[in-house]
Amino acid sequence: MQISIITVGKLKEKYLREGIDEYSKRLSAYCKLQVIEVNDEKAPEEMSAAEMEQVKRKEGERILAQIKQDQYVIALAIDGQMWSSEKLSAEMDKLALHGRSQVAFVIGGSLGLADQVLKRADALLSFSKMTFPHQLVRLVLLEQVYRAFRISRGEPYHK
């Protein structure tokens, strides 16, 4: 399976980079992983609703340019469905069974995802109703994808 993580912005924090590197290494035994970082838009603290939409639209265009036609797209969105680790594993197994071996997970910037990205998504996934920094979500996502592969193969994992 080929997993792409398409995310807005560069990772700056060393502790997150170390965690992401660790899970990327672990995932190499299960899939081909690609992390694609698209540039984020400069966004001042105070913005109008129209300015926020413009930032999301520009970031969204960059995201959409990275999505391949045949990829199954799972967008991380606060209004998405909340899945257990077992459900994520089952969904990934189902995709593989149906020949959908290219999966893209999309993580938006600090303002979230543009409507055009949400419309392109085949599924919307939420980790929580809480808001998390998008850089931290990248680490949590990689851990959950790793856990999903372990569950699928009947290998031990922490519950």
Curated annotation (Swiss-Prot):
Q: Does the keyword S-adenosyl-L-methionine apply?
A: yes
Give the residues the record marks as binding S-adenosyl-L-methionine.
76, 108, 127-132
| Leader sequence residues | none
Give a yes or no for keyword rRNA processing in this entry.
Answer: yes
Q: Which GO terms describe its cellular component?
A: cytoplasm
**Key words of the record:** Cytoplasm, Methyltransferase, rRNA processing, S-adenosyl-L-methionine, Transferase
The protein's matches in Gene3D superfamilies, at most eight in alphabetical order, are given as: 3.40.1280.10
EC main class here is: transferase
| Annotated GO MF terms | rRNA (pseudouridine-N3-)-methyltransferase activity
Spell out the reaction equation it catalyses: pseudouridine(1915) in 23S rRNA + S-adenosyl-L-methionine = N(3)-methylpseudouridine(1915) in 23S rRNA + S-adenosyl-L-homocysteine + H(+)
InterPro entries the UniProt entry points to: Alpha/beta_knot_MTases, RlmH-like, tRNA_m1G_MTases_N
Q: Which SUPFAM superfamilies match?
A: alpha/beta knot (SSF75217)
**Could you say which EC number(s) this protein's record lists?**
2.1.1.177
Q: What is its main location?
A: cytoplasm
Q: Which Pfam families match?
A: SPOUT_MTase (PF02590)
Q: Which CDD domains match?
A: RlmH-like
- Location(s), subcellular: Cytoplasm
> What function does the entry list?
Specifically methylates the pseudouridine at position 1915 (m3Psi1915) in 23S rRNA.
Assembly and binders = Homodimer.
Concerning its family, UniProt says: Belongs to the RNA methyltransferase RlmH family.
**This chain belongs to which protein, by name?**
Ribosomal RNA large subunit methyltransferase H
